[in-house]
Regions:
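C-terminal accessory segments
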Residues: 89, 98-151
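Short, polar loop/linker segments at the starts of domains and inter-domain junctions
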Residues: 38-40, 45, 119-126, 141-144, ...
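Feature marks short, surface-exposed loop/turn motifs that line or immediately flank catalytic pockets
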Residues: 32, 151, 172
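Right-handed parallel beta-helix/beta-solenoid
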Residues: 109-116, 154-184
Length: 184
């Protein structure tokens, strides 16, 4: 799963409220929580939730890309073998949220091929290659799994499939087009 250049009110890629979420082999980049408050996380906002992140890349443009809040109940974030912009100090923990920063995490530019053109393949020099959890299934090339949505080398063109829209006033019986967005 790749979520990039998305803009929402809270959690530009993921907004978790009273949820349990596993984020594995995902890439979140350059998303925006477009509110007047900076505490809503450009990439991930979590409140009264448990989120597990593994073998993923979360690489936004600002500090505070991940907000772990405990506003209405316990909230926990578990991160391992992932490339997180700003590293552990870049995660904003408010009101007693719990962060479990486990093995294998890095804070290095993932070196995407061309993120401005939505090409999130890893370049040959990417620090995310062979940097995933060594206990995960191997990549198709037989090496340790990579971080992020794509394995390297991957000789496929990026998928320019359909774009679906989601809005708070949407309806899941809609077709997901701009005029008729989904609700979730």
């Amino acid at each position: 799963l790749i979520i990039a250049h998305n803009q929402t009110g809270m959690g530009g890629a993921i907004c978790a409220i009273q949820s349990d979420i596993q984020i594995v082999h995902c890439t979140f980049s350059d998303n925006n929580a477009a509110t007047q408050w900076s505490e809503y996380g450009d990439e991930i906002y979590s409140n009264e939730s448990t989120i597990m992140v593994q073998n993923s890349i979360i690489w936004g443009t600002n500090d505070g890309d991940i907000i772990l809040d405990d506003f209405s109940g316990p909230s926990e974030l578990i991160i391992s073998y992932s490339d997180i912009r700003g590293g552990e100090p870049g995660i904003l923990i408010e009101n007693g949220g719990l962060l479990n920063w486990l093995d294998g995490n890095i804070n290095q530019d993932p070196l995407f091929v061309n993120p401005d053109e939505n090409d999130y393949l890893l370049t040959v020099d990417s620090p995310c290659i062979n940097a995933g959890n060594p206990d995960s299934p191997l990549d198709p090339d037989g090496t340790i799994t990579d971080m992020g949505a794509y394995s390297f080398p991957l000789n496929l063109e990026p998928n320019n499939g359909p774009i679906f829209y989601i809005a708070q006033d949407g309806d899941d019986s809609n077709n997901g087009f701009f005029e008729f967005p989904f609700a979730s």
